[in-house]
Amino acid sequence: MSRLSIYHEDPAGEPEVVSDIDTIATRLNSIGVQFERWHAGRILTGDAGQEEVLAAYRDSVDRLNKRYGFQSVDVVSLRPDHPEKAAMRGKFLAEHVHDDFEVRFFVEGKGLFYLHVGDRVHLVLCEQGDLISVPANTPHWFDMGVNPNFKCIRFFTKPDGWVADFTGSDIAKRFPTFDEHIAPAS
């Protein structure tokens, strides 16, 4: 189940936790983050490739492409047996910003976005069917867990794709990892 947990940037206390999709979308919208639920136009097999995935979500993908003028769209898939999973996970674990907004749609599996806005950190557990759009220059990080298992559609307005500017902050080390965060809910 998708979930929003809102912590103070000093995570000593208990977070506010929201699991209703509409409430999650409303709360995230209040900080400029788009969050919505999509449904596939057809059933996908577990080994569906990029073309099959994009075809299943064609109407939603086309709507976003028209609205934002994305220059490229691709599908990334990461499984627990991927030989580079630790290196790929490490790439996203430190707080960073982008000069462009970051849009991800979860076709399968789950991942955890951490959005550092003001004196709060919003942990957004995204699962199958969730679309999240993180505004440009929003400090954030992402954790896929030690055994990642997800498939995402990624949208880019620039041809060079994902380019991060790391903030140098160690704030990410003070918050639960993906695996720690989902453990109580599993």
Task: Describe these PLM feature segments.
Residues 37, 74-77, 154:
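Structural signal for conserved beta-strand scaffold positions within catalytic alpha/beta enzyme cores
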Residues 1-70:
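N-terminal leader/capping segments at the start of a protein or of a new domain
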Residues 85, 113-115, 122:
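Short, solvent-exposed loop/turn segments at secondary-structure junctions
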